[in-house]
C-alpha cells in the first residue's frame, strides 16, 4: 500500500512540476510598440503592425511557446502602460538607459544605435549652426535623445530651441515644410527617412551610442528569461540575417 501511494504521489508531483514549467507556454502577451518608428515598428499599408522588432517578436513568441499581439501606444507614456499592465512588454526600439532601468528590466541588448541630426537634403547648415544658432530642432518626446539634448543645451549653453513631436516622421515632415531646421533621432529611422524623403543625415551630435533591449516589468522574471533565450536563438539563426537584410540595418 505504501509503495502504491508513493507511486501515485510521485506521479502527481511530476504532473505539477510539468504544469509549472509550462505555465507560461501558450500565454498571450501584449507587446507595446511605437507605430511610427520605421524600420523597427510601424503600421503597414494593410493596417497591420510590422517592422524589424515586430517580426523578431513573432519569431521569438513562436519559438518560446507564446502568442503575441502588437499594440500601438504613445511612446511618451509607454513605460507607464507597461507598469500599469496595459501591456506585457516593449519590443520596439527602446534604448536601455539608467533611468528606465530604475523602473523596468531589460533583456540583453540586440542592437546598437547612435543618434544623428537630419536636415533638408539641400541644407547648408552645420552642426554648430543647429546647436548654437538659435535654430529650431525637432525631437520625439519621451526619447533618450530628447532628454540628452535638453540637459546638454543647459549644460553647454547651447541656444537651440527644441520642439517636441509624437513621432520622428512628424518631425521630418516639419523639416520639409520649413517649420524646423533639423530633427534629432536614432540613425536607423533617420536612414529610413533619408531613403524615402528629401532629407539627409547631417551627422552625430555628441551623444553616446546606445543599446536596444526588450523591456518587461521587474517582477516578470520568467518572461525576461524566456525573452533572453528567444533572442539568443533568434540572433544565432539565419532568420536574424534575413531580417537585418530585409530592413537594411547596418
Language-model features: locations:
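A ligand-binding cleft/hinge motif common to bilobed small-molecule-binding domains
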Residues: 77-80, 93-102, 148-151, 174-177, ...
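Extended ligand-binding regions for polar small-molecule ligands
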Residues: 54-63, 122-128, 134-144, 213-250
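Ligand-binding cleft/hinge of the Venus flytrap
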Residues: 43, 57-65, 145-164, 194-195, ...
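Alpha-to-beta junction loops
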Residues: 66-67, 83-92, 134-136, 167, ...
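Extracytoplasmic small-molecule ligand-binding "clamshell" domains
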Residues: 25-93
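Short helix-initiation/N-cap motifs at beta->coil->alpha
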Residues: 54, 69-80, 124-125, 162-177
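Acidic, polar ligand-binding/catalytic clefts
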Residues: 62, 67-131, 200-207
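Periplasmic-binding protein-like
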Residues: 35, 112-119, 191, 195-232, ...
Amino acid at each position: 500500500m505504501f509503495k502504491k501511494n508513493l507511486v501515485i504521489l510521485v506521479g502527481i508531483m511530476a504532473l505539477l512540476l510539468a504544469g509549472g514549467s509550462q505555465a507560461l507556454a501558450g500565454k498571450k502577451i501584449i507587446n507595446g510598440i511605437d507605430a511610427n518608428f520605421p524600420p523597427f515598428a510601424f503600421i503597414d499599408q494593410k493596417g497591420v503592425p510590422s517592422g524589424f522588432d515586430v517580426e523578431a517578436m513573432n519569431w521569438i513568441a513562436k519559438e518560446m511557446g507564446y502568442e503575441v499581439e502588437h499594440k500601438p501606444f504613445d511612446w511618451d507614456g509607454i513605460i507607464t502602460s507597461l507598469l500599469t499592465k496595459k501591456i506585457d512588454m516593449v519590443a520596439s526600439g527602446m534604448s536601455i538607459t539608467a533611468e528606465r532601468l530604475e523602473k523596468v528590466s531589460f533583456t540583453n541588448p540586440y542592437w546598437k544605435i547612435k543618434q544623428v541630426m537630419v536636415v533638408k537634403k539641400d541644407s547648408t547648415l552645420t552642426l554648430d549652426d543647429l546647436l548654437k544658432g538659435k535654430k529650431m530642432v525637432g525631437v520625439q518626446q519621451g526619447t533618450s535623445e530628447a532628454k540628452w539634448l535638453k540637459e546638454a543645451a543647459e549644460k553647454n549653453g547651447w541656444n537651440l530651441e527644441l520642439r517636441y513631436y509624437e513621432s520622428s516622421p512628424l518631425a521630418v515632415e516639419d523639416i520639409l515644410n520649413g517649420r524646423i531646421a533639423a530633427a534629432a533621432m536614432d540613425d536607423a529611422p533617420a536612414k529610413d527617412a533619408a531613403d524615402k524623403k528629401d532629407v539627409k543625415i547631417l551627422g552625430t551630435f555628441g551623444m553616446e551610442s546606445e543599446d536596444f533591449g526588450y523591456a518587461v516589468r521587474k517582477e516578470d522574471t520568467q518572461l525576461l528569461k524566456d525573452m533572453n533565450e528567444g533572442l539568443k536563438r533568434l540572433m544565432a539563426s539565419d532568420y536574424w540575417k534575413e531580417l537585418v537584410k530585409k530592413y537594411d540595418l547596418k
